[in-house]
């Protein structure tokens, strides 16, 4: 029978190993610029031959025009990840600018592969996230210019501009080169093909007619 000390060591080793694989893998060289044309399929992208790498692979020109906020939810998320900057490959980070119209929101969503840290540049935001089952505890805060808030990886979170007259702007950093996003309403009511209305009616404890109406709506994508 294994000794208690060995069992403890094995448990700690398993925990450390899990933590090591719970985020983007660490780079094994100075950089690994994404080769988007490589036929090699890996978790991420294969490396471009370093002799073809230039400064432009680590660069994205400034977008001086204010992004549009004319969609139904009143926000525009401009994500800069490995698809826009190939040099981010293996570096485990990306960034997004979020513009909010007056009373606009970035609706409840989750990033399956990243923690997010958000800084308000202009205006005021009501933000929050909800913990996992069974507690489903809401942690929320009103942020002003310069304030910072963290959304843990995988948890549902949101931002809302409560000002009916002024827009707001925020910058978010995310701990993955490709954090992904699942907007809850879009995924549940706008999936293709649609989820059975019988399933959703029972899940939300409403009539099928309500579900059919929700599924008939156009679910806005505010990520560009």
Swiss-Prot record:
Glycosylation site list: 76, 135
Family: Belongs to the germin family.
Pfam families: Cupin_1 (PF00190)
A GO term from the CC aspect: apoplast
Known partners and oligomeric status: Oligomer (believed to be a pentamer but probably hexamer).
Ranges where the Cupin type-1 domain occurs: 62-212
Chain sites annotated for binding Mn(2+): 109, 111, 116, 157
PROSITE patterns: GERMIN
Signal peptide from the UniProt entry: 1-22
Organism name: Oryza sativa subsp. japonica
Function, as annotated: Plays a role in broad-spectrum disease resistance. Probably has no oxalate oxidase activity even if the active site is conserved.
InterPro entries per the UniProt record, alphabetical: Cupin_1 (IPR006045), Germin (IPR001929), Germin_Mn-BS (IPR019780), RmlC-like_jellyroll (IPR014710), RmlC_Cupin_sf (IPR011051)
One term of GO molecular function: manganese ion binding
Taxonomic classification: Eukaryota, Viridiplantae, Streptophyta, Embryophyta, Tracheophyta
Protein name, per record: Germin-like protein 8-9
